[in-house]
């Protein structure tokens, strides 16, 4: 959604992007805006199925990390640590995962806000807030 982040491009999303995932791989990137087009173009450029795979997921626990931190830095000076860590985010990542045997240059880290995350039936994040 608007305000989520794409750390590969070091930008906040300006329009909604919907990833359709089947069998551990993105099969469609839906959205009419520039953000969806950039994601489609970037992943297609690698010509590898692994670029579309789920890499890793997680959720942020750091109450002092800031969602808006990226707005304060030039792209060259920012690697997204705070956005990966801010409390209540859900981090969805695609592409490379050496542990899973997926070697590709295609990779996205997408810290998402407002999600509900369950682990083994227990809610750990509810609507973007730590449970």
Language-model features: locations:
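Metal/cofactor-centered catalytic core regions of large enzymes
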Residues: 1-131
